[in-house]
Regions:
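N-terminal, membrane-interfacial amphipathic/helix-forming hydrophobic leader that caps
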Residues: 1-75, 87, 204-250
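Alpha-helical transmembrane segments and their helix-entry boundary regions
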Residues: 11-12, 39-42, 78, 142, ...
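Juxtamembrane helix-loop-helix connectors linking adjacent transmembrane helices
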Residues: 35-36, 65-134, 145, 149
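Membrane-helix interface segments
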Residues: 38, 74-76, 120-121, 151-156, ...
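Structural signature of hydrophobic alpha-helical transmembrane segments
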Residues: 43-51, 123, 133, 170-175
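Residue-level signature of the transmembrane alpha-helical core
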Residues: 79, 83, 124-129, 133, ...
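Membrane-interface helix/loop boundary segments of multi-pass membrane proteins
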Residues: 134-160, 187-194
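Functionally important transmembrane alpha-helices
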Residues: 172-228
Length: 250
């Protein structure tokens, strides 16, 4: 086995252990309590797991927290462009799905369970901050970063990391949207050599779910779709042409 692949697998297993261990303990302890206390225990155990994950992977430099190939004078604009890309891709996907009449919402007990898990302080922190950071550590920092260090072709590596990312986010339309998101953020990671744009985009994307633009007219969604596509294209073009000193990456 290639040393790079072996290291990637080991880091992924470490990440998976941290991702699962404390929430499993929290779920077991929570069985001795009634709702909503059991959900609070689970949410705080998830948060602690993410915090430990972040400390270990960034502290040990298993995943590098830097701006990579982004020129120093372009760091602030890169942050702004990351937010722009996050907002534009979110509105593009939502408006396209609305025009196609595709519902991403879970139903019944599963919907209620997920709503409870993202409510309260711990739930909001998990959904909007710590889960995005933890997922970027894994899917871009570990998997994509590891594959790019091997003989794997760039787009194959991006597609593999996006596929694994999507598999963690359900099936059907949720899988497709997560796959597209993973390809976009994976390309940015390859282009910049940095996990930071992906973290910013992921945090912004998850935070935007609090904005409700459902039950609008098709004209509204069409306008949002067109504007979003233009802004998204500009953001991608900016990272391709403006943010990087190509002589530093060659």
């Amino acid at each position: 086995m290639d040393d790079g692949i072996g290291k990637t697998i080991k880091l992924f297993l470490l990440w998976l252990g941290l991702f699962l261990a404390l929430p499993i303990i929290g779920a077991i302890v929570g069985r001795f309590f009634t709702s909503p206390a059991n959900y609070e225990i689970l949410k705080w155990s998830q948060l602690l797991g993410y915090v430990l994950m972040i400390i270990i992977f960034f502290g040990k430099r298993f995943v590098e927290l830097s701006f990579g190939h982004i020129e120093r004078r372009m760091v602030r604009p890169a942050v702004g462009m990351s937010v722009l890309i996050a907002a534009s891709q979110a509105f593009v996907l939502f408006s396209a799905l609305s025009l196609l009449d595709v519902d991403l919402q879970f139903q019944g007990e599963e919907l209620e369970r997920r709503q409870r898990l993202v409510s309260g302080i711990a739930g909001i922190l998990n959904a909007c901050i710590f889960a995005p950071i933890g997922e970027e550590i894994c899917f871009r920092g570990i998997i994509l970063g590891g594959l790019l260090k091997t003989r794997c072709r760039t787009w194959i590596a991006i597609l593999i990391s996006a596929l694994v990312f999507a598999s963690f986010h359900g099936f059907g339309a949720n899988f497709v949207t997560a796959m597209l998101f993973g390809i976009l953020v994976g390309w940015l990671y390859w282009r910049t050599g940095s996990i930071i744009p992906g973290i910013i985009i992921h945090i912004t994307n998850n935070s935007l779910t609090a904005i409700d633009i459902s039950n609008q007219t098709n004209i509204f969604y069409l306008i949002i779709l067109v504007v979003g596509l233009v802004l998204l294209a500009y953001g991608v073009w900016w990272f391709w042409k403006k943010a990087i000193n190509d002589s530093a990456t060659s």
